[in-house]
């Protein structure tokens, strides 16, 4: 089955310049898994006849039934470049054999956390775009994530068979379509990238360089300009000069590639290339890309699909394609597949593009180190990562847990960035909350086994050097989802991954049979391990809550919980949306609270953030870890804060990083520093559980105006100050016109023109509003973009399909938080209903607590 043994893989692992770690990313249903098949069959794991139908990397039963990828799956491939191709590689190399660790990731937005986990352990990405529907929302989201992790993209235009057979495009129209997609992708890259002066250099994609592939995953054929340039160089060389050396040949091919794209034209009469669109005698010349590349492909398609027997035979002979005896009898589409697959095999084109243009760990870790490692840039660990040194200290990042066949145990899946990981090695296992020098979230344990991930199988292996992707056994008890594994005593953590979506939809679950409760709790623990994104929370009322990114994500999680993790029947509530609390103006009075012993007083006010600041904090533009003066300057310039106040930010909350700020604007208060920690603790508590219905607060700035304290330290301990600070914060929120915020999805709907009216109807019923509608150039499809409250999104897909006759395809991405119009104190308004429902669900007292509970009189 597999053409190479573990020992051969192990030998290549040491040649770190010849390793490529890459993931396949794209919009949902643009053909990632199908394309991955061509690569896998080239490296000898599926029989080539079945490629395109197997979807080898969809390992789960529900993935095969639904025809979608849910989890990202890793697989190692081995590929040898010919001597001629080696000359195209611009980085260091070591022999001709390459080890490609490929991760096929899901495209569905609900699983974009899986994509993040896949991107963290790879250095390059194959971005797949359907050339009929073009660049979609999810393409942009995953590409943006890739660029943020400093991952080099190459592009693949998939589904060319559709463009030729369904849309029947002319060569020039097809060229324009490709040109437009390349431009769109480059716009995204230049928007989020660091430019040519950045550490990665220029990462724009360009067909001339060979970083764009064209083809069809389903039919199993693909090419880059390099393949055609080679054919023509060979053809022209046969006419004239003798044999070329490999290096000269590579140079020739690279020159040829420049002529095959863009505004270059070919004169078939003279066989010369020209830069003007008309020949000297005034004839209109064809574009080289159309004449020399698309034309032969169109001819093959035309001859075979219109059953022109003689022409087909001629073409097959001319292109020098050897068909098997069984292939010779085929006709129509099966013959087309066989011919195209022999002439332009997808595996070769893509694997060459990957090995030539994607960086090896040696190249990539130089510029990715500063993003990956939290510690100082010059300690042993950082140096080991930068130089990808197998003799350095072990540094390994675990990006996710993979369930094993044995119930309840997990493989830890991740990548070795420095050093060597081996069976039985004693290591430090550090969770995300570990800080150097402290004991919490740190375990010293041996690794039981190291294994190779091979799609549906695992292979044991003795040890794995840096630059490779590996699974570990026996680490799963000590980590929840992600973590760092190291042998270096003073190592800091590898940075935690940033997810592009947040878990905003929740359901409560309980066991149908109360005796099964322990199994449910155990199952929830395993579920939290197996999915990078999901959150499992126990409410104070004893309810078990699961929070996910959307309906589909939750559905899959609950199915996993029931069938794999807890193995018991489960009851679930209707999905509930999490809200945020905020304020809409400044507090109308200065709020005073006294401590329980009446010796200390705090005075505070609350006010809303200027627009955009909360989003900046979410993105990390403004954060607690920034340098003080730099942060103050940013706030003063962009949001017109007073510089003196901006320098006296005490903290962010909840959890020290959230979108609320506590600033100290007191003047000359005694003992202030002694109670700072207590006030901060009260602030974290208050922002985590707001005054209205104990939801997180968002976008509130609290100012401490004045503090009067008892002179004796024993009377101003934490027990006196923390609850007082919390009461005072609540009072200042309640006097500042509190409001609720709800999460909003950005919905992108693709549909034919005639059903656009039906879409507007559904969106209006669901409180959605359309903000952009455009036609996809060159196709009859419309794209409608709208904002839709998450609360209204349940059953939205089904509703939309029934109103449009199943012709509209929605894609929902969490976009932003928006204030729910209405006053929560007015009993008839929507927010007051939400508050009442939430309080009831959480088992709190009915009604928003009165202001008198928090506000004291002098």
From Swiss-Prot:
Residues found modified as Phosphothreonine: 54, 57, 59, 435
Post-translational modification remark: Phosphorylation by EF-2 kinase completely inactivates EF-2; it requires prior phosphorylation by CDK2 at Ser-595 during mitotic prometaphase. Phosphorylation by CSK promotes SUMOylation, proteolytic cleavage, and nuclear translocation if the C-terminal fragment.
Gene name of the encoded protein: EEF2
Protein name (database record): Elongation factor 2
Residue numbers bearing the N6-succinyllysine modification: 152, 272, 572
Keyword Ligase tagged: no
Subcellular localization: Cytoplasm; Nucleus
InterPro entries assigned to the protein according to its UniProt record, in alphabetical order: EFG_II, EFG_III/V, EFG_V-like, EFTu-like_2, G_TR_CS, P-loop_NTPase, Ribosomal_Su5_D2-typ_SF, Ribsml_uS5_D2-typ_fold_subgr
Enzyme class of the recorded protein, top EC level: hydrolase
PROSITE patterns registered for this protein in UniProt: G_TR_1, G_TR_2
GO terms, biological process: translational elongation
Sites where the protein binds GTP: 26-33, 158-161, 216-218
Organism placement in taxonomy: Eukaryota, Metazoa, Chordata, Craniata, Vertebrata
